[in-house]
Amino acid sequence: MAELENRKQFAQMLAPGVKTLKLHPDYKVRRKKNEKTGQSYIDKIALQLGVSPNTIKSWIGQMGANYIPGRIDDGKLFGMIWIILEKTDLDIEWLTDLLEATTIPVIKPALPVWAASCLKKAKILRKDGLFGAPSEGEIENVVKRLFHDRPGQETNALTEQPITHNLPSRWSGRFIGRSFDMEAIRQWMLSPSPVCLITGWAGMGKTTIALEAAYSCVDDTSVWPAFNSIIWVSADWKGLSFSDFLNTIAYQLGRKEQIDKSINVKRFVVRNALANYTREKPILLIVDSIDTAERDIHEFITSLPQGVKVLLTARENVKQTYRESFGEMTAIQLSGLDQTDAHEFFQQEVHHCLQTCNLPRKREKLEQLLHLSSDLKNEFISATAGNPKAMALSIAYMSDDDIPAQQLIHELGKAGYSLLELFEFLFGRTWDRCNEDTRKLWQTLCFFSKPPDEKSLAAAAGLDARRFHYAMEQMRSYALIQPERSQGRTQYLAHQTVVAYGEQHLSEQHEYEKEARNRWAHYYIDYAETHLKREQPNSIYWSYLLGRNLDQMKQEWPNILKVIQWASETEQKEILIELITRISHFLSRINLPLRIEYGRKAADAAHHLGQHTREAYFRIDTSGWALMEVNDLDGALQQIEAGLKILEQSDAHDAYDLKVWGHALKARLFLKDGQQEKAETILNEIENQPISPTIQHRVLLVRGDLSFARGYHVEAIQLYEAANEISSTYGGEKTIEAYFNLGVAYVKCDQFEKAEEAFEQMLYDKHNANQVELIYYHYGMAQLLYRKGEKTKAVESNQKAIRLIDSWEPAIGIRGEVERLARATKENE
């Protein structure tokens, strides 16, 4: 029994760990409709430990200080500790601090062997239905996580330090005014208050001041507080999904492997990563335009760990949403610039227009604006309510309008517009002065998930390069858009009020919207064609087998995905089919669940249009192959057989080839299921069939798998080598399966140099390999090292593979093999 020497301290240390489990998907409570009570997360933990829920509540002080026990059974205590350390990001310091409140001996600084010995005492309900200690492999995984960053411990190749910040570029060269508001933000950063909300009308500069405050923390650490990381998330472009929100945070914290995970897993991991990184210094999380974001984002913010400071901007006042959760929060209501700052902003904006203008008449009008009387400037500032965006739009309008500036200022003053009416007036007058091409650009801005570049925006609007640049120059001169140079190309950023006004006009132009969306979609079809299509093989589907440089596709992926989603939602079947045909193989390295989802939708679309061969491709390879990769063998078999049935009625050129591949895939599926005889029967039936090199390559790989499964390793090597030689006739594939299986076969034959060479063939760029490549590489090297007798290195390499599997796709088919090797290395120690 463990005696609790300091019961209060023990409860205070244990409680946060237990409560953190409440958010974990394994313990999250799901009550049925109209059900008054249900199993709580503590009930689930209690079941796993074999104690009552009240026992756990007493341990964490939830029933009062008098009910905290004086002693706890070692197995139960370490069982509780095991669950917390396995499911959360709590570190070794938490464990030592907790145990110091007991009579259990503590080694400081902690050592891996000591931590492992503690966890071996845990008694939990295991998967086999018996109470006992976790497996050796499970304990080793947790211990490696606890000590991964200690000197002498090799770190995971994919573990990254948090990026300092991801702030966008400043919109203006010099920030003017707002000294009182800036000081209020600085004081909030230094205070215990977790949330600061900046509200104000559109165009007041909420984004600008939030950005300036963030840059102040980066540039001037002597006055502004230092943060471990500053994370900027913007909902400005067409709203912000919860998944995008979590992805951004995960990426900035060096957890990019979480990007393709389920929402529940990602939510839990991201929250714990935030807690982990805030132990030394706080993190500043800035969410721009929070009022347009999904409700889940609001809920996530209200449960952030201590040490995360959240700066929000919103047009609407959402104070009540957060006040109920935080009690104390800082709220800053931005009003217009004061007279002095507004005068300075006026001068700066006019000078900026002069620098970008080379038209004599327009320059003359701008010069006149510089010399307006103070009274006229004051009248102008009053009419625009000191709103920076309204002032910029007005200056751009006055410099181009035939009406004298003085007259327009008087008209604005007399009209007494509200700010909303003023924007309508300014956008309306600006719209009237825009030429047709500029209006086209303006209306198509709303198509994009991320700011477009010249080619995509021009294509959507239907403009050639000359007309695009003329229209873009007009948009710039009217202060509607801001070019930003990033990653070697120019993107065009627009304020959300500008995008919304263009979308409003687009909704009234049904014919133009139809044409523009069609151009937009076909631009991205052509984009995928350009960046994915190979010269060989010549096929409607196999031509898009992956090359190796996917940077261009990844840059535009958010916008491509938006086209796919639009095509699916609006039943643009032809467009969906063309896109999925091109990106199916790309999705195998980006997101297998998306490949499955849209592969099925594309198959349904092809079925509706009578495109039988395309439907078969989508069912057999796009969906069937991917389902097999995530170990859904029943789902894979269903799709493959549906595709084969379709091909019975097709005499298309590709149909025979695809039919052979469908049968070979079935054989591969039976091999995965341990049914070697069924697999062999199918392979014998399709033997010596006249097929293309692309399919021949794949069939030989499956034949190699059968030989390998039967222990005929030399024969397997011959088949794998033959498959790779055939693929070289059409440019090669360098598929992971081909080189991984070849490498393992060489390991079995003790040809270690050739094995290592084969494994390295999977990594096109060793320094920038993706997760799935690294999973197979580390597992292959683990087998090689184990065969050579280098047991310690083998275990380390295998653990890397397991960690990558957990973070990329836990259901990936190879997982069982990797775990079997982990058990084998333990048994032979």
From Swiss-Prot:
One of its GO terms (biological process) is defense response to virus. GO terms for cellular component: cytosol. InterPro entries: AAA+_ATPase, NB-ARC, P-loop_NTPase, TPR-like_helical_dom_sf, TPR_rpt. GO terms for molecular function: ADP binding; ATP binding; ATP hydrolysis activity; DNA binding. Residues 42-61 bind DNA. ATP binds at residues 200-207. TPR repeats lie at residues 697-730, 736-769, 775-808. Changing residue 289 to R: In gutR1; results in the constitutive expression of gutB. Pfam families: NB-ARC (PF00931), TPR_8 (PF13181). The keyword Heme does not apply. Transmembrane segments: none annotated. Keywords: Activator, ATP-binding, DNA-binding, Nucleotide-binding, Repeat, TPR repeat, Transcription, Transcription regulation. Activator of the glucitol dehydrogenase gene (gutB). This is Transcription activator GutR. It comes from Bacillus subtilis (strain 168).
